[in-house]
């Protein structure tokens, strides 16, 4: 190793996927490609320019680097960067129906849910998972009703800002 070089860093980067890998994958499949772990608007724009089907805005649970920004912080920036060109899925921090509501308002087309389902499965098996799904949906519908949103399409960033009518 030369001065200032890190064997660990070099090894991690050696195995990290590149934009060339995305292009290679596009060349061997006709399946839609969705990239996970996109947090920066520049990366989102690059992915959109390559024609991927979607992005999963994720910080991998913050476990890889604990100072990684929260997905809710970066989602609006990523959404603005791609301007509706591709599907955005948010992964991380979804625990309640109001979290789903906020993610949709901030630009997500869908959310991924992990831990709540695992906890529900461990506690009560398949019935626990069904109950967790029902809770998320009920909480989302309540948040929609209280915000005056009759459909998912009506959930916009404005739904997160109190108005004179709600004061």
Identify the residue ranges that each predicted region occupies.
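Charged C-terminal helix
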Residues: 139-167
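C-terminal helical cap(s) of enzyme catalytic domains, especially alpha/beta-barrels
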Residues: 70-80, 121-141
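Alpha/beta enzyme core
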Residues: 1-90, 98-119, 155
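Short coil/turn linker and secondary-structure boundary residues
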Residues: 17, 124, 147-150
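A short glycine-centered flexible hinge/capping loop motif at secondary-structure junctions
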Residues: 93-94, 148
């Amino acid at each position: 190793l030369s001065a200032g070089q890190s064997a660990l860093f070099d090894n991690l980067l050696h195995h990290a996927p590149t934009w060339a890998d995305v292009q290679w994958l596009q060349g061997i499949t006709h399946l839609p490609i969705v990239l996970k772990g996109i947090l920066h608007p520049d990366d989102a724009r690059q992915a959109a320019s390559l024609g991927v089907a979607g992005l999963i805005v994720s910080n991998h649970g913050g476990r890889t680097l604990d100072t990684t920004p929260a997905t809710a912080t970066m989602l609006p920036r990523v959404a603005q960067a791609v301007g509706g060109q591709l599907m955005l899925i948010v992964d991380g921090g979804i625990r309640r129906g109001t979290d789903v509501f906020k993610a949709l308002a901030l630009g997500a087309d869908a959310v991924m849910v992990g831990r709540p389902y695992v906890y529900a499965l461990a506690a009560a098996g398949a019935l626990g998972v069904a109950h967790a799904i029902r809770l998320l949906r009920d909480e989302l519908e309540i948040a929609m009703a209280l915000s005056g949103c009759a459909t998912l399409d009506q959930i916009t960033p404005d739904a997160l800002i109190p108005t004179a009518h709600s004061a």
